[in-house]
Amino acid sequence: MSLLTEVETPIRNEWGCRCNDSSDPLIIAASVVGILHLILWILDRLFFKCIYRLFKHGLKRGPSTEGVPESMREEYRKEQQSAVDADDSHFVNIELE
């Protein structure tokens, strides 16, 4: 009984791999998927804060302020700032000088 497998066979006094079917489309597809998975995983680890912040808050920029009086713009800015200052039911009081 031999301990050698089909993959590990002695070829010319060295251990090697017989890869006669390396042009098989399934092997090529699996290699491409593996490489893409590795690239996406690396990008995810490098930029996870930016990526998940975009998913959480979206790309909201707010409504256009064109044609709106400056007093209303300032009121809207204060409302938005107070909404940002509230963090998971912990409200932050900011005193202006």
Swiss-Prot record:
One MF annotation (Gene Ontology) recorded for this entry: proton transmembrane transporter activity
Covalently lipidated residues, kind S-palmitoyl cysteine: C50
Domain of life: Viruses
Lineage of source species: Viruses, Riboviria, Orthornavirae, Negarnaviricota, Polyploviricotina
Biological role stated in the UniProt entry: Forms a proton-selective ion channel that is necessary for the efficient release of the viral genome during virus entry. After attaching to the cell surface, the virion enters the cell by endocytosis. Acidification of the endosome triggers M2 ion channel activity.
Record topology, Intravirion segments: 44-97
Cellular component annotations (GO), alphabetically ordered: host cell plasma membrane; membrane; virion membrane
Disulfide bond among keywords: yes
Seems to be involved in pH gating (site feature) positions: W41
Activity-regulation annotation: The M2 protein from most influenza A strains is inhibited by amantadine and rimantadine, resulting in viral uncoating incapacity. Emergence of amantadine-resistant variants is usually rapid.
Segments on the Virion surface side according to the record's topology features: 1-22
Modified residues (Phosphoserine): S64, S82
Further details from the record: When the channel is activated, one or more imidazole moieties of His-37 probably become bi-protonated.
Record family assignment: Belongs to the influenza viruses matrix protein M2 family.
UniProt source species: Influenza A virus (strain A/Malaysia:Malaya/302/1954 H1N1)
Site positions (Essential for channel activity, possibly by being protonated during channel activation, and by forming the channel gate and the selective filter): H37
Stated name of the protein: Matrix protein 2
